[in-house]
Amino acid sequence: MNRQFRAAARVLIRPMIPGLLVILLAAVSACSDDPDNPEQQVRDMISAGEEAVEARSIIGVLDFISDEYQDKDGRQKQEIKQLVAGYILRNKSIHMLTRMQHVALNDDETRADVILYVGMAGVPVASVDQLVFTRADLYRFDLSLVLEDGDWRVARGDWHPARLEDF
């Protein structure tokens, strides 16, 4: 029965987990070479977030999700916390390859919309060509970031499967 429960949980949760991790990776703050350039801050944050997810730092990642987070399915920060913790604990190794397609800041530069493509695998992935051989999961993420107390945080995230050609 325990095996059946775990199998059912994987079927239900697996499609959500990679998306949640990438949403969370986008929330991790980082210093920019040009602290006055919000777009560069967002790009640096994505890079630092990738490192936090690969380091499997649950607390490090979750600290940067907005307390006001809510996605289209009604999930809030607490549900994200549970899903991320479960995914990180079940995976001994997490490796990501990210490609940012688009960053758009609002007029007062306190909100940003990001389109991000992510390949997630259990082994290191250094190039798009390796995504095929590692059987990586490929996703497109549409993220809404908000500037809170000087740090960019994820306020909303939606995702769906991507194709290799998207990278």
Regions flagged by a language model, labelled:
Residues 36, 40, 55-56, 74-78, ...:
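Soluble non-cytosolic domains of exported or imported proteins
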Residues 46, 83, 96-102, 127-129, ...:
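Short structured motifs
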Residues 12-16, 148:
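Sensor of tandemly repeated, compositionally biased sequence architecture
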Residues 1-13:
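N-terminal secretory signal peptides that target proteins for export/translocation
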Residues 105-167:
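Exposed beta-sheet edge and beta->alpha loop/turn motif
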Residues 15-27:
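Bacterial N-terminal signal peptides
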